[in-house]
């Protein structure tokens, strides 16, 4: 399904001219571009001190083309992409059956990733991708959407707070023997009648 989002529509603002990008469901042919986009955004966000072996291995293990190829055929995963002229600008990845003990009770889904290339931040892509992710989660019966952003990703924490997500405590993300604090953010959703 292709969804064209009018500027401002995703935030409930006055509708302006149509942007030159659109949202659509990812397909298996997107795996390569999703992989590279994810690596780029991850490194821009988390490798602020440069690249070291632990980060390099984590990126190659978590964001390979094969990882995305598998996700795109998984029954409990949905990926929505923002595209312009055949180029991916960002994506949202949902795990429809994921649960977290710190998230509010009820049927849950996880926003595993919401990544937008840096040149396109501020262009409402993140807002539109999040709105679509919330809609998909609701359509699949989730009453709660949760995510775990890094505690030092202040821009992401503020982005989600402005969109109604509340902090439910700390969790750890561990790779290569290193643990990094993340926050559990969650938002209650109205379950869609399509569920």
Where are these regions (language model features)?
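Short, structured active-site-proximal loop/turn typified by the sulfatase FGly-forming signature C/S-X-P-X-R
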Residues: 164
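Conserved beta-strand-loop-alpha-helix junction that forms the acyl-donor binding cleft
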Residues: 147-157, 174-179
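Active-site acidic-Proline motif in GNAT/NAT acetyltransferases
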Residues: 117-119, 123, 151-152
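Acetyl-CoA-dependent GNAT
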Residues: 3-9, 16, 21, 25-31, ...
């Amino acid at each position: 399904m292709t969804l064209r989002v009018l500027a401002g529509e995703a935030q409930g603002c006055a509708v302006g001219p149509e942007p030159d990008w659109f949202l659509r469901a990812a397909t298996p042919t997107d795996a390569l571009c999703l992989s590279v986009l994810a690596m780029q955004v991850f490194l821009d966000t988390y490798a602020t001190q440069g690249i070291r072996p632990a980060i390099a291995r984590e990126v190659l293990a978590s964001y390979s083309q094969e990882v995305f190829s598998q996700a795109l055929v998984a029954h409990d995963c949905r990926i929505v992409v923002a595209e312009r002229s055949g180029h991916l600008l960002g994506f949202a990845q949902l795990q429809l059956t994921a649960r977290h003990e710190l998230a509010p009770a009820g049927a849950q889904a996880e926003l595993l990733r919401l990544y937008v290339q840096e040149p396109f931040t501020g262009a409402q892509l993140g807002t539109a991708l999040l709105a679509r992710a919330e809609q998909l989660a609701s359509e699949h019966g989730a009453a709660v959407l949760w995510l775990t952003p890094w505690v030092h990703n202040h821009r992401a924490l503020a982005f989600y707070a402005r969109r109604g997500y509340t902090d439910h405590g700390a969790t750890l993300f561990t790779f290569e023997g290193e643990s990094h604090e993340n926050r559990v953010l969650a938002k209650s959703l109205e379950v869609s009648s399509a569920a």
